[in-house]
Amino acid sequence: MHRCMPLVAASMAALMLAGCGGGDGDTTLSTAAATDTTTLKTAATTSISPLWLTIAKDSAAFTVSGTRTVRYGAGSAWVAKSMSGTGQCTAAFFGKDPAAGVAKVCQVAQGTGTLLWRGVSLAGAEFGEGSLPGTYGSNYIYPSADSATYYKNKGMNLVRLPFRWERLQPTLNQALDANELSRLTGFVNAVTAAGQTVLLDPHNYARYYGNVIGSSAVPNSAYADFWRRVATQFKGNARVIFGLMNEPNSMPTEQWLSGANAALAAIRSANASNVVFVPGNAWTGAHSWNQNWYGTPNGTVMKGINDPGRNLVFEVHQYLDGDSSGQSASCVSATIGAERLQDFTNWLRSNGYRGFLGEFGAASNDTCNQAVANMLTFVKNNADVWTGWAWWAGGPWWGGYMYSIEPSNGVDKPQMSVLAPYLK
């Protein structure tokens, strides 16, 4: 799951997307059509793990409609009760203080059947991989809050924000860079204040200056330190989701699991209660989740994930071209998107997890437009395990990139008309 396109803009023609290169290596995918590619027909059902969204801060009043399960606490320490009507986010109301001396929140368990998030990746802050850390405004750029507003007005309630770990933390186990943190928090604060959710995406492919997480150069403890610092910065914002990493690849799946669990432990030790999105190995491809060409399958290893806060979603990426790399203007068939999601959907339901389609995209042509529509219909029809999706991509420096939906001089890109029915 990997896409690589030149960034074409008047002053930025020399830039290339961070991480450009070889695709996910699987070119022998079956494209046999299912009987019905927009609904799921197989997989044994188990209880789906709840997803928790914050509804009140410590000491605040809140109201729930109907009878709901609400929990009170922080990080990995919680007490829960079934209730209706009005409550107080206090130890007195819940009968126990699960985390003494720590600022707590109240979260409500989200039901299944409705997609929570629909949005877009706004690229730019991850650009300039060959110029790390690079010069802001020359090698990379953060999108503007106005750009996010355009997508909000289209009905998108989530922005995925790619950025580079090396810029935010220039030295492992040391403080976050003040200037980069200011850019990041400025965007996050403006966009979340306007009502959208921001998915933070360290766009590093499980690497730091080219060294893989879990190696002697980048031990799991350093990765955990990074996430502890980021979680501490954003734990007070209920509209921030932590995406652990963009597209881990070319490493043992077990090694990635170890790093992911270290990051989750660090996030919860910082008393952050935010939702966390967890990718798999092999560019986190949905189509290859249970395949073994990259080593032990994600579908086997990632069942060992351990979130002390019990508030995670598995993030997968899925493109529609022949090798699922997202580097072609063609799509295999009108049904290929739904077909490639089905096995992962079965896995989610069989194991009680929830998923998010963190990247997908296509050029605008008849086959691809129908493939995108069928894929999104499939996700919508399986919302008991799917939580939403984010298109790849928007952002200010794309120029003529074939998957971009960034408007040009105020004019919508053609793909927006395909997405529009799914934003209502």
Curated annotation (Swiss-Prot):
Chain positions listed as propeptide in the UniProt record: 20-43
Superkingdom of the source species: Bacteria
Subcellular location field: Cell membrane
GO biological process terms held by the UniProt record: cellulose catabolic process
Mode of membrane association: Lipid-anchor
A GO-annotated cellular component: plasma membrane
Main location: membrane
EC number: 3.2.1.4
Stored SUPFAM superfamilies: (Trans)glycosidases
Top EC group: hydrolase
Signal peptide stretch: 1-19
Record-linked Pfam families: Cellulase (PF00150)
Active site, per annotation: E247 (proton donor), E359 (nucleophile)
Keywords assigned: Carbohydrate metabolism, Cell membrane, Cellulose degradation, Glycosidase, Hydrolase, Lipoprotein, Membrane, Palmitate, Plasmid, Polysaccharide degradation, Signal, Zymogen
N-palmitoyl cysteine lipid sites: C20
Molecular function via GO: cellulase activity
Catalytic activity: Endohydrolysis of (1->4)-beta-D-glucosidic linkages in cellulose, lichenin and cereal beta-D-glucans
Family of this protein: Belongs to the glycosyl hydrolase 5 (cellulase A) family.
Name under which the protein is recorded: Endoglucanase
Provenance organism: Ralstonia nicotianae (strain ATCC BAA-1114 / GMI1000)
